[in-house]
């Protein structure tokens, strides 16, 4: 099993979200009226996930249906996106060597879908070399790397998942393996802590309601100390979405239920999934992997390399994308990924 969500253009179709309660419906009507009166237009890229209705509902839900607060939040996000040219992130230059070097210090990848159809982001947090990566990229570069990933989720993975399920899929499922977490490399390191604060603030202010759940695996004693600091950056609603799993069989059972089967759980978490190229490659604290990047990482990199002025067909397979991009050999393995047919596994 490997991530097979098709690549989509930010303008590609999605499934519009809808109000879930009469209160939301009433607030949505008032929100639209307020935006019209103030001549606020929601950018098309912000509507990629759930349509314009979905975009508006996320801001309403984040502000507990307070139209005035939701309007202020939305206006701030639109201004922030314009000032920082966020729409161009997926088309801005992506250096191949830098991408591979960063992946070596930050083992993470997308990993199919969970049982609810949400795209899964998987990260071996305990093995990440945060201090080295922040030093290498700087605060701005580290944040930009995160934002590029958020835009990919928001404008590509979530719309694709929605179309696949024919219903709104507007949130992500994160699985983080915090085994061997180093306090020095995270909350005890001033620059890393500063970077984590910046990411938490941006996510809260400009990507509301993007997170469905974060499953925390293999939590060591150091995680308690780290979490006591990190949670201070998060609002109570986001904190509640972090679920620390038990150990051993208890953890495996929880992952199996959440991800939709033991064959969807990576071997390093006790499961039976064997992704072509690995579920998460390049773990610097463990054995080296045969390949540099997972299939999902290669797909992500190729998407960012693509000429975004031309639309990317919904049903492109990795081979088609590789051909269109000059067969980028991101793994240095003669394009093994390009030979794989892009067939989505059943959830």
PLM segments and residue spans:
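Basic, amphipathic alpha-helical/coil surface patches used to engage anionic, phosphate-bearing ligands
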Residues: 1-347
């Amino acid at each position: 099993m490997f991530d097979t969500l098709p690549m989509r253009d930010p303008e590609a179709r999605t499934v519009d979200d809808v109000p879930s309660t009469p209160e939301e419906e009433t607030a949505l009507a008032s929100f639209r009226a307020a935006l019209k009166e103030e001549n606020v237009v929601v950018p098309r890229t912000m509507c990629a996930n759930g349509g314009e209705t979905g975009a508006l509902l996320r801001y309403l839900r984040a502000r507990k249906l307070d139209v005035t607060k939701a309007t202020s939040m939305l206006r701030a996000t639109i201004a922030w996106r314009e000032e920082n040219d966020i729409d161009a992130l997926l088309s801005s230059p992506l250096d191949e060597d830098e991408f591979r070097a960063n992946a070596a210090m930050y083992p993470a990848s997308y990993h199919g879908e969970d049982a609810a159809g949400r795209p899964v982001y998987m990260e071996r947090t305990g093995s990440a070399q945060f201090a080295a990566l922040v030093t290498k990229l700087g605060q701005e570069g580290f944040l930009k790397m995160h934002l590029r990933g958020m835009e990919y989720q928001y404008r590509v993975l979530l719309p694709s998942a929605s179309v696949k399920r024919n219903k709104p899929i507007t949130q992500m499922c994160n699985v983080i393996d915090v085994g061997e977490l180093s306090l020095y490399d995270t909350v005890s390191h001033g620059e890393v802590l500063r970077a984590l604060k910046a990411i938490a603030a941006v996510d809260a202010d400009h990507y509301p309601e993007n997170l469905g759940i974060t499953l925390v695996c293999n939590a060591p004693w150091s995680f308690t100390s780290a979490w006591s600091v990190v949670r201070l950056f998060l609002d109570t609603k986001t904190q509640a979405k972090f679920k620390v799993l038990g150990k051993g069989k208890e953890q495996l059972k929880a992952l199996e239920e959440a991800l939709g089967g033991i064959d969807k759980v990576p071997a390093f978490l006790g499961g039976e999934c064997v992704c072509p190229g690995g579920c998460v490659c390049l773990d610097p604290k463990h054995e080296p992997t045969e390949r540099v990047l997972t299939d999902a990482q290669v797909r992500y990199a190729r998407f960012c390399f693509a000429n975004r002025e031309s639309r990317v067909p919904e049903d492109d397979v990795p081979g088609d994308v590789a051909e269109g991009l000059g067969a980028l050999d991101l793994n240095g393995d003669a394009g093994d990924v390009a030979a794989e047919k892009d067939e989505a596994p059943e959830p």
